């Protein structure tokens, strides 16, 4: 029992020593990855020839990338500042206003997505728990570069025999930046693991701001990135 206790104590000591980094070191880390984003209360209302289609939003995938600087102010704590691009927004399932079993003229919408393009400035404190393993939290202001809605609309006619004749799909892409807030503030929390200067990280952003000017809607976003740490000051 005593031997097990000392082995556990030794393991704890080794983990804590190996987790320590040199105080005063400065690094930069280019990184790229994937964002999975949605908008809370982000339902889209399609008005088609007097018919309203209320469609809930779903998560969409996007690109994120940039660089972060980190200064080691304590042996187990670092402060980082970054500049990242992130594609956020949401995706919508395909819908139409067709009444099944009833002849008439209808419209269908497909490949509908909302894209919000942000520059993010994350400021985080990282706590190194063990060799290569860290947890992070901080604050992140973001600035909206642009917002676009894209979808394909197809008009079609259903005959009395149930057969349908479709017009060619029309692609629509329009800027809707004026509908959205110019900035966003979020609390990022994450966990990372580093091996041989390669850093894999997952974060979630708790948005504090309304993303849309008139609705109580907020960004929801996960990010998964891979970066490479370069030493500037040792």
Residue ranges and their predicted role:
Residues 202-212:
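Transmembrane beta-strand segments that form the barrel wall of outer-membrane beta-barrel proteins
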Residues 30-34, 63-71, 83-85, 121-129, ...:
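Residues on the lipid-exposed face of transmembrane beta-strands in outer-membrane beta-barrel proteins
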Residues 23, 74-76, 130, 195-198, ...:
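Outer-membrane beta-barrel channels and translocator barrels
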Residues 20-68, 231:
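Short glycine/proline- and aromatic-enriched beta-strand/turn motifs that initiate or cap beta-hairpins
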